[in-house]
Design a protein with these regions (language model features):
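A conserved acidic beta->alpha catalytic loop
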Residues: 42-51, 70
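Short aromatic/hydrophobic "clamp" motif used to bind/position activated sugar donors
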Residues: 90
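Donor-binding/catalytic cores of nucleotide-activated saccharide
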Residues: 74, 95-208, 213-231, 241
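Catalytic core of nucleotide-sugar-dependent glycosyltransferases
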Residues: 210-219, 224-253, 266-268, 272-296
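Cell-envelope/extracellular polymer assembly enzymes that use nucleotide-activated donors
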Residues: 4-7, 37, 193
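Glycine-rich, basic loop-to-helix element that forms the pyrophosphate-binding segment
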Residues: 68-85, 98
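Membrane-interface aromatic/basic loop that binds lipid-linked glycans or pyrophosphate carriers
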Residues: 1-3, 35, 45, 113, ...
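Short, well-formed alpha-helical segments that are part of the catalytic scaffolds
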Residues: 14-28, 52
Length: 325
C-alpha cells in the first residue's frame, strides 16, 4: 500500500442525501486509492451522514471521521481537518459537491510541475441538473504568478472574488505559514478574509485546467439558501478582510478593491433582507453601518461609483446615515 500524497478535507452537516456521491467520486481520483487520505468532519449532523460516509468509503484505505456533538460551523470544521494534514498537498470538498475522475491526480501533477504554493481551477454549478461552467477570473492558464497580481483592478471580478476553498489544491507550506486556517466561529463568508490573506501573503499560484468539480446549488439546507441570523456572519468576515488589507504594506494599492467588494456584498444582502425577520433585518442594517465605518472614508465615494446603479441606490440611505452620525 502506498502512502497518501494528498489530504482531502470534507466537512459536512446533514449531508446524508448527497455525501455518498461525494465520497464515491473521491474514490475515483487516483489509480491507486491509497494515494488519497480523506478526513471527514461530521459537524453535528442529525441525519445519517456518518453512516453514509462509512458505507461509501469502505474500500478507501485512509479515512478518518471526526464527529462534533454540536455544529461548530464550516470554518471551524475545516480547521479541524487542517490540523490533521500530514501530506504534501491538501484540498477541500463540501458534502454536497462532487468531482470528475482523476481531478486530484491532475492537480497533483500541476502542483509538482509548477512548484507553486497553490493552484485554482474553474468549477461547474449544478442546479437541479442544469449545469454551467464558471471560469476562474484570471486569464493566463498554467502560468505561475504572484497572487498579489491577481487582485486588481478594483472594478472587475478578480481572484479575490472567487473565494471557493474547494476550487483548487494547496501545498502544505501554505499551512505551515499560517495561511490555510479560517476565522473560527463564522458560519458564512468564512472564505472572504481567507482568500485575501492567501493572495496577499502566499508567494506563488497558478490557474490550471483540470477535470471538473461540481458545485450543487439550490440545496435547501445550504447556508447560501437560508435567510436567518447566520447570514449576518458576512459582517465580521468582511471586517476581518478589511483589517487584513489594512495591515498589508501595500494597503493603499488594495483598499479600493476591498472597499468595492464589501459595499457590493452589503447591497446584495440588503436586497435580500426583505425575506428576513424584522429583528434580523434590523441587525443587518446596524451591522452594515458599522462595516461602512470600517472602510476608510476616502474610499467610500470611489467604491460607490464602481457599483451598479441599483446597488448604489440600495446603499444610499445607509451611507448618508453613516456620514451624518
Amino acid at each position: 500500500m502506498s502512502s497518501p500524497i494528498v489530504t482531502v478535507i470534507l466537512p459536512a452537516k446533514d449531508a446524508g442525501p448527497y455525501i455518498g456521491t461525494t465520497v464515491t467520486t473521491l474514490g475515483r481520483q487516483f489509480e491507486d486509492p491509497s494515494r488519497l487520505r480523506l478526513v471527514v468532519i461530521d459537524d453535528g449532523s442529525t441525519d445519517d451522514t456518518r453512516a453514509q460516509v462509512q458505507h461509501f468509503a469502505r474500500e478507501m484505505p485512509h479515512v478518518e471521521i471526526l464527529s462534533n456533538p454540536q455544529p461548530v460551523g464550516l470554518a471551524a470544521a475545516r480547521n479541524q481537518g487542517l490540523d490533521l494534514v500530514d501530506t504534501d498537498f491538501f484540498c477541500f470538498v463540501d458534502g454536497d459537491d462532487w468531482m470528475h475522475p482523476d481531478r486530484l491526480e491532475s492537480l497533483v501533477d500541476s502542483m509538482r510541475r509548477l512548484e507553486c504554493d497553490f493552484v485554482r481551477t474553474d468549477h461547474v454549478t449544478d442546479t437541479d441538473g442544469r449545469r454551467r461552467l464558471m471560469r476562474a477570473p484570471h486569464g493566463p492558464r498554467g502560468r505561475v504568478v504572484s497572487p498579489r497580481d491577481a487582485i486588481l483592478p478594483a472594478d472587475e471580478t478578480t481572484m479575490v472574488d472567487y473565494p471557493y476553498a474547494w476550487a483548487g489544491m494547496f501545498h502544505r507550506r501554505v499551512l505551515d505559514r499560517g495561511l490555510a486556517h479560517f476565522e473560527p466561529g463564522l458560519f458564512t463568508a468564512e472564505d472572504r478574509p481567507w482568500i485575501w490573506r492567501l493572495h496577499l501573503r502566499a508567494e506563488s499560484f497558478a490557474v490550471v485546467d483540470a477535470p471538473a468539480i461540481l458545485y450543487r446549488r439550490g440545496v435547501t439546507t445550504s447556508l447560501t439558501q437560508v435567510l436567518d441570523r447566520r447570514q449576518l456572519d458576512f459582517l465580521p468576515a468582511f471586517a476581518e478582510a478589511i483589517r487584513v488589507v489594512e495591515d498589508d504594506h501595500e494597503a493603499d494599492r488594495f483598499l479600493p478593491k476591498i472597499a468595492t467588494t464589501t459595499m457590493s456584498v452589503c447591497a446584495y444582502h440588503l436586497f435580500r433582507a426583505r425575506a428576513m425577520s424584522t429583528a434580523d433585518r434590523t441587525a443587518l442594517r446596524t451591522g452594515i453601518r458599522d462595516l461602512l465605518r470600517a472602510i476608510p472614508a476616502e474610499q467610500i465615494d470611489p467604491a460607490l461609483s464602481r457599483l451598479s446603479d441599483r446597488r448604489r441606490r440600495i446603499l444610499a440611505r445607509l451611507v448618508r446615515e453613516v456620514r451624518s452620525a
